[in-house]
UniProtKB/Swiss-Prot annotation:
PROSITE patterns: UDPGT. GO terms for biological process: coumarin catabolic process; estrogen catabolic process; liver development; response to 3-methylcholanthrene; response to Aroclor 1254. InterPro entries: UDP-glycosyltransferase (IPR050271), UDP_glucos_trans (IPR002213), UDP_glycos_trans_CS (IPR035595). It catalyses: glucuronate acceptor + UDP-alpha-D-glucuronate = acceptor beta-D-glucuronoside + UDP + H(+); 17alpha-estradiol + UDP-alpha-D-glucuronate = 17alpha-estradiol 3-O-(beta-D-glucuronate) + UDP + H(+); prunetin + UDP-alpha-D-glucuronate = prunetin-5-O-beta-D-glucuronide + UDP; 5-epi-5-F2t-IsoP + UDP-alpha-D-glucuronate = 5-epi-5-F2t-IsoP-glucuronide + UDP + H(+). The gene is Ugt1a7. It is a single-pass membrane protein. Its EC number is 2.4.1.17. GO terms for molecular function: enzyme binding; glucuronosyltransferase activity. Belongs to the UDP-glycosyltransferase family. This is UDP-glucuronosyltransferase 1A7. Residues 1-25 form the signal peptide. Keywords: Endoplasmic reticulum, Glycoprotein, Glycosyltransferase, Lipid metabolism, Membrane, Signal, Transferase, Transmembrane, Transmembrane helix. Homodimer. Homooligomer. Interacts with UGT1A1, UGT1A3, UGT1A4, UGT1A6, UGT1A8, UGT1A9 and UGT1A10 to form heterodimers. It comes from Rattus norvegicus. Glycans are attached at residues 71, 293, 431. The lineage of its organism: Eukaryota, Metazoa, Chordata, Craniata, Vertebrata.
């Protein structure tokens, strides 16, 4: 028992402090994805550094965010394209989204202008393995694990090439590779396929469409990832599929949770860390505090379409500006395009804004978002109702989830008018049910035993300490498709049943012939004798 003048928590805290000092300091290889994907992945990496781990991040020389000064070792490799090529391909993809709204389902995405952008990303892996000096360095470094974003596939190839346990960090994976790689059951009867904008209560027609989409993914996704698998096969010197690359993953860290996601079965090595990006809110700067204070009793509306979309076609920008000018709130709009000529006095354009910090301010009334997972979770964490303008990818599903839960209104950004946006904003601001619903979601999301960032760090360290997590790997990985569905067992049992039925039938037929066939012949012979 602790002395009276010593706080009761001190001995426990001292023990934990001493125990942490004897923790395993490992060596982690990180293969990240550029853009907003890197923002939250970097949080995990930086949280690992004070624990004594050595972190090496491998990045291409050409990137948007990865080339910025970092607090850990960075190894770069040259690529065959320039920054202008990367910007051009991405701009081409983004511009196409402002011309035609992406149709529901993965298949339209596979045939969209995104193909050229992905081909550029996939080519990074060939460039990495052409750098023999870098490959030799990685080989000699004796890493404990690979921490990777699977979006460009290269991290999976790196893990397999060096035979290292891997931790995937992702929002999700379009196509069926998440289910096949993790072996999480995904019955199309109630688990909607990505980007279909469906819920788990589907009509018969929706279930038909969901199943067809599932079958279509198996037919067309391999061709979309052909460049990536060709490069992986070339590097590994053996033919591989996407499933071959995903199957060895030790732990899956998914940036979602069941506050947003629909309930579904998961495996023990699938860990949900939704809201990892909004764990810590800071006071807003003096500049933004001045904007907020000047808003008066009406408060502010935060408007951002994400870090990768900061310009909008002029006509659409003017429609948006007109709608924003009709509401009494102060609008803080992250926008770097041409200033709309009709911009109202209540709308302030900024090149960057502290989104999470502003949403956490008591005067935040609404959030206009493109429905990316980072923004959606910041809205949930801070309890701010949303007006959602999804453009592509998982944004469609995110918006549908929030709208279904009564926490926001979804608009078709290409077809909406100034009146539509005005009405949507007034609805989520003035209708109390939206605020109540988002606060309920916020309460559910925050009611957890451990912060998502700490949970992510724990599992990365876990894989490093134990050199993987094979005990969490389901045996389904080792079964063929017909064994997984017990078709061989069903066939065997069916064969037994049919054999028994056949034997019984033949026995009965034989018995009948013996019993009745013989009597018939006797009677017949008897009649012939009398004649």
């Amino acid at each position: 028992m602790a002395p009276a003048d010593v706080p009761a928590s001190l001995p426990l805290g001292l023990c934990l402090l001493l125990a942490s000092g004897f923790g395993h300091a490992g060596k982690l290889l990180v293969v990240p994805m550029d853009g907003s994907h890197w923002f939250t992945m970097q949080m995990v990496v930086e949280k690992l550094l004070p624990k004594g781990h050595e972190v090496v991040v491998v990045v291409p020389e050409v990137s948007w965010q990865l080339g910025k000064p970092l607090n850990f070792t960075v190894k770069t490799y040259s690529v065959s394209h320039t920054q202008e090529d990367l910007n051009r391909e991405f701009k081409f993809f983004i511009d196409s989204q402002w011309k035609t709204q992406q149709e529901s389902g993965v298949l339209p995405l596979l045939t969209s202008p995104a193909q050229g952008f992905f081909e550029l990303l996939f080519s990074h892996c060939r460039s990495l393995f052409k750098d023999k000096k870098l490959v030799e360095y990685l080989k000699q470094s004796s890493f404990d694990a690979v921490f990777l974003d699977p979006f460009d596939v290269c991290g999976l190839t790196v893990a397999k090439y060096f035979s290292l346990p891997s931790v995937v960090f992702s929002r999700g994976i379009f196509c069926h590779y998440l289910e096949e790689g993790s072996q999480c059951p995904s019955p199309p009867s109630y688990v909607p396929r990505p980007i279909l904008k469906l819920t788990d209560t589907m009509t018969f027609k929706e279930r038909v469409w969901n199943l067809l989409s599932y079958m279509g993914e198996h037919a067309f996704c391999p061709s979309f990832f052909k460049t990536a698998t060709d490069i992986a096969s070339e590097v590994l010197q053996t033919p591989v599929t996407m499933t071959d690359l995903f199957s060895p993953v030790s732990v899956w860290l998914l940036r979602t949770d069941f506050t947003l996601e629909l309930p579904r079965p998961v495996m023990p090595n699938v860990i949900h860390i939704g809201g990892i990006n909004c764990h810590q809110r800071k006071p807003v700067s003096k500049e933004f505090e001045a904007y907020v204070n000047a808003s008066g009793e009406h408060g502010i509306v935060v408007f951002s379409l994400g870090s990768m979309v900061s310009e909008i076609p002029e006509k659409k920008a003017m429609e948006i500006a007109e709608a924003l000018g009709r509401i009494p709130q102060t609008l803080l709009w992250r926008y770097t395009g041409t200033r709309p000529s009709n911009l109202a006095k209540n709308t302030i354009l900024v090149k960057w804004l502290p989104q999470n910090d502003l949403l956490g301010h008591p005067k935040a009334r609404a959030f206009i978002t493109h429905s990316g997972s980072h923004g959606i979770y910041e809205g949930i964490c801070n309890g701010v109702p949303m007006v959602m303008m999804p453009l592509f990818g998982d944004q469609m599903d995110n918006a549908k989830r929030m709208e279904t839960r009564g926490a926001g209104v979804t608009l078709n950004v290409l077809e909406m008018t100034a009146d539509d946006l005005e009405n949507a904003l007034k609805t989520v601001i003035n209708n109390k049910s939206y605020k109540e619903n988002i606060m309920r979601l916020s309460s559910l999301h925050k009611d957890r035993p451990i912060e998502p960032l700490d949970l992510a760090v724990f599992w990365v360290e876990y894989v490093m300490r134990h050199k993987g997590a094979p005990h969490l790997r389901p045996a389904a990985h080792d079964l063929t498709w017909y064994q997984y569905h017990s078709l061989d067992v069903i066939g065997f049992l069916l064969a037994i049943v049919l054999t028994v039925v056949f034997i019984v039938y033949k026995s009965c037929a034989y018995g009948c012939r013996k019993c009745f066939g013989g009597k018939g012949r006797v009677k017949k012979s008897h009649k012939s004798k009398t004649h």
